[in-house]
Amino acid sequence: KEKRQKNWDSVKSKHSISDIPKVKSAVKNAQIFVRTDPIFDGFSDELEGVLACEPDVVMLPYFKTVREVETFIKAVDGRATTSLLLETGEAAEQIDDIISVGGIDEIHIGLNDLSHSYGKKFLFEELADGTVDRLVERFKADGIKNYGFGGIASLGSGLLPAEMIIPEHYRLGSNCAILSRAFCDVSKVGDIDEIRRIFDEGVSAIRDYEKKCAAMSEQELSENSGALKQRVEEIVSNMQQ
């Protein structure tokens, strides 16, 4: 990822396999989710090291081919829940063949890399132009029940407000999301108590807002989707000026 996103304003984690037990010891009421490196020559050894730590979920990022997914699913061999981070145009264009591999428990659409893969300027363009809708249709048709997309900032923040993004998860039937760096940028917030406060209050606010989204009618969700598309167009237009 460091090579792929060298000049991007993005999160590049420095975690290692040795960090997994440390996280497990600190987490009491949540699943342990580990993202591996993409398939490479030493992938098998890396994955075995990850699985030895007994995570609940293992995610494969930045794959482009059916063969890579086959390698991943076969190597995990039922020892953890499998998650695919779909973030390349190559993978998106052959999603039916990828899903047909079987053994895939969940798929997350990574809008950051995917937007760059398609030559877009703003990561939520794929949400506005129907790309995410088309992928979700394929997930549903092929029996993938657990899926999600993008990142969510705290309420009241983000270039594209979280208040517009969260209803899209409900419209599309998404049941998972990743908190964006804008939710809590730990490179700028160094105090652990402050980080804890941000997460506690921020997640609680999102949960409360989710209740409102769950009660929205189809018309209200559709109207929000239209407003989101218009807002994305405005953002992209401003980027081009």
Could you tell me what each predicted segment is?
Residues 1-241:
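Expand to "…catalyze enediolate/carbanion chemistry for C-C bond making/breaking, isomerization
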